[in-house]
């Protein structure tokens, strides 16, 4: 514990918690302070001027990060027949129908993202209480209920990130690894921010992007000037 506390304290040296950094400087500082013995995830959090308790202020969507996420994503597909074969050929890790529903109902979830063909949704709907809280329920709004399972699987494997605003008006996501070069991280962060901006709901009033911050898994958070993200 003493070693961990010392490392955390050292990672905060040279960081001004009150300062608002430009994106390039913030990425450099975060990378320098990602000193854990594993490849830390770089995370972005955006505080939005919305109240998600109101339906017209919900923010959700999906973005394909140009440089991927750096993590291996296991994909499950609910499909039958030719579509099941298509999913397997595209690289899905788990494919099934009633059999897969039973497995998930039994508590075994060995995947990170879930896709379904439209005809499977009455069946998959039974899993709402299991998949919903984990943010895995297939949804046509984010492209996970689709007949084009090949594109959906490849997108999921290739860096697709879903986002959804939380109760406090915060939307966050992992946008890469500390091992990524700074340019790749900046491109991913800008792509994520752009997607969140484009998902601005009609009910949002006033300042939409209130605050932005980035951090590594074990490192300190740094505030970012939204203007350096091309965010208004």
Curated annotation (Swiss-Prot):
It comes from the Bacteria. Pfam families: Ribosomal_L1 (PF00687). GO terms for molecular function: rRNA binding; structural constituent of ribosome; tRNA binding. One of its GO terms (biological process) is translation. Transmembrane segments: none annotated. Disulfide bonds: none annotated. InterPro entries: Ribosom_uL1_bac-type, Ribosomal_uL1, Ribosomal_uL1-like, Ribosomal_uL1/biogenesis, Ribosomal_uL1_3-a/b-sand, Ribosomal_uL1_CS. GO terms for cellular component: cytosolic large ribosomal subunit. Belongs to the universal ribosomal protein uL1 family. Binds directly to 23S rRNA. The L1 stalk is quite mobile in the ribosome, and is involved in E site tRNA release. Protein L1 is also a translational repressor protein, it controls the translation of the L11 operon by binding to its mRNA. Part of the 50S ribosomal subunit. This is Large ribosomal subunit protein uL1. The gene is rplA.
């Amino acid at each position: 514990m003493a070693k961990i506390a010392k490392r955390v304290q050292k990672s905060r040296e040279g960081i001004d918690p009150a300062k608002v950094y430009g994106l390039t400087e913030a990425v450099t500082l975060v990378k320098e302070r990602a000193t854990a013995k594993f490849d830390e995830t770089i995370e972005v959090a955006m505080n939005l001027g919305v109240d998600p308790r109101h339906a017209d202020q919900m923010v959700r969507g999906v973005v394909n990060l140009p440089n991927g996420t750096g993590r291996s994503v296991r994909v499950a597909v609910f499909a039958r027949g030719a579509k099941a074969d298509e999913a397997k050929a595209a690289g899905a890790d788990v494919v099934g129908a009633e059999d897969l529903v039973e497995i998930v109902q039994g508590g075994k979830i060995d995947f990170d993202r879930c896709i379904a063909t439209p005809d499977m949704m009455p069946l998959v709907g039974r899993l709402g209480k299991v998949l919903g809280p984990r943010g895995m329920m297939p949804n046509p709004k984010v492209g996970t209920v689709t007949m084009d399972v090949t594109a959906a699987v490849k997108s999921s494997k290739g860096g697709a990130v879903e986002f959804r605003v939380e109760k406090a008006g915060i939307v966050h996501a992992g946008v890469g690894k500390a091992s990524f070069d700074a340019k790749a991280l900046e491109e991913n962060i800008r792509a994520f921010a752009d997607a969140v901006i484009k998902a601005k709901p009609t009910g949002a009033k006033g300042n939409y992007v209130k605050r932005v911050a980035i951090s590594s898994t074990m490192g300190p958070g740094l505030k970012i000037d939204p203007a350096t993200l091309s965010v208004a």
